[in-house]
Amino acid sequence: MAEKIGVAIIGGGVVGCWIALELSRTQKEIFLFEKNAGITRGENQSSRNSGVNHAGINYDTLTRPLKARFCVEGNRLWHEFCTRYALPYFRVGKIMVATNKKEDEKLDLHLKRSIENRVPGVRRISRKELHELEPNVRAISALLIPTSGVFEPTSLVRQVYFLASNQGVQFMVGTEVIDLAVEGGNPLIKIRYRDGNVDWVKPEKLVNAAGVDAVNLARMVDNNFPLKTALIRGDSMKFRRGARQELEYNGTNIYPTPKTIQTPFGLQHTVGVHLTPMFDYVDGKIQIGDTVMVGPKLTQVKSQHDYITPMVEPGEFIQHTSFFPGLKASDLTPNFGGIQARLNGHPDFFIGRDRGCDKIIHLAGIDSPGFTSAPAIARYVRENFFQTV
């Protein structure tokens, strides 16, 4: 007989951990199941991203309303959270550059969108001001987005985990969900523990926040689940700023004008290959150091485990960084790769109840800006699906 439990959450990435923390305010018993051996040392995809706290100017409210809303809310919530707990986070801002007239026209679109999304402080800057901020960046025009920042993702996930654990959340690491079912109107979960033993548990409510596995799990209870995913790998490189004069860089996020591209899995929005300062250990503390990330370069892959061996040559990054002309392929060394699941033909996040069991909530396609949006997503889940204790 399956053991009855309170709330079950599948997935110990940043979204799952934030949901656990948010629900711990009202729910008495919460179990989070994570198939990896741990959560706090960068074991999950959440730690393999650029570490940018996005401001929210890339997402229109017509086709991507959840991303538009949660990115702006999440940016503010992360800023408050990191300040409160003295986490490695700096509001370094972002400069979005245009290198030709067509891109310059798109800056107006993003400036208008920043107003619609209520992103504070966004403005055009002159070439003179751009030169004062980042002398080695070349562009005909630019936007300054001051609320964007950078954080060290693993440290943030660790803090959310510790807070949730202190609130009584039970984190079952090394425990994989291998089947889902519905019995008598209630969710039923088949789990395999780290020692190989298998068991069934019956939660009162289930939150599927399994990241790249979310759609596969949804199909276990709904063969006709309407969404499909493509696995997208993002590769990045790095260089050392100041290695020579052309590589001097003051640490502002530098982004190209976003593009919408046609791919085998549909239209995809991409923020492009950008420059982002990285955290290093400086005098025994995690601080912004001299390492600069260049990326990501996106490639569709077949396996969620295909992120170890570099797939992109340095020269391919240089093709996308004309706004930083002093950078050469020989300056670049491999950094890291990560996998995200993007929904085919659905540019927004998906957050909703299972069609056959309203006690199951699925979160799918939580790609960029998923990390930034995580605290806002968690609040939304609590307010919309857990109104009663």
Where are these regions (language model features)?
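Glycine-rich FAD pyrophosphate-binding loop
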Residues: 25-46
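N-terminal Rossmann-like FAD-binding beta1-loop-alpha1 element of flavoenzymes
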Residues: 5-32
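Flavin-dependent oxidoreductases
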Residues: 18, 180-185, 189-295, 301-308
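Helical element adjacent to the flavin cofactor pocket in flavoenzyme catalytic cores
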Residues: 143-205, 209, 375
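Dinucleotide-binding Rossmann-like beta1-alpha1 core, especially the glycine-rich loop
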Residues: 51-129, 270-273
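C-terminal catalytic lobe of FAD-dependent flavoproteins
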Residues: 307-389
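Short beta-strand to alpha-helix junction loop
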Residues: 62, 66-72, 97-106, 144-162, ...
